[in-house]
Amino acid sequence: MILFEPTLATSKAVDTSVRISLSGTDGLLLDVSCGPFDKALQQRLWALNNTLRDPQSFPGLVETVPGVNNLLVIYDPRKIPPDAAAQVLSDLWISSSPTPINGKRFVIDMIYGGERGMDLDYVAEQTGLTQRDVIALHSSVTYTVAALGSMPGFPYLVGLPPALEVPRRQVPRTLIPKGSVVIAGEQASVFPCPGPCGWHVIGHADFDGFDSQAMPPALLSPGDTLVFRPKAQLK
């Protein structure tokens, strides 16, 4: 159920980029997706998430979960009704502005192709590139962690060169290993633990992205940047 759209907003200010809808009985999903990933919109979401850490900003707030182009807000509906909560969230979004995060920088060594990069050849075929070109492009850019999700410590990485964009697999794999380096659409990632996946596996890295005994348990955070460095080249 959509609570807020630009034409329905009761605020004096109207932001045509946002939609707020119910998510269960105690959640609101603020969605700003409007096509390709927009870094400025994502930075506004980060800023809004930081604002919501102030308990005075949103009565009854329980938890926030930042996503790619969206933000899930969990609240106590006994303290604030859904319509009022949506209005507060809309007003806070309107007053937010893009705020870059000074994140950490990581360099991840990886091996492309082989048994643990079984989709490298497929990606090359689909993009019309050689395998060496795929490796060169994938390792030539700096990726930004837009959000964590899907599984504990799983980073949604933006910055994949457009030439490497391929649709997700039609049939997902039920299990791929920890450390699998994957791409799909305009995003990339590296698996923090074994799990199912519908993305294309192009390589493998020694990557410890999640430790339940650590604080914080996830190695990466939104705003962090990373580069993939080829550990071994194809011969």
Where are these regions (language model features)?
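Glycine-rich active-site loops that engage anionic ligands at enzyme catalytic sites
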Residues: 2-235
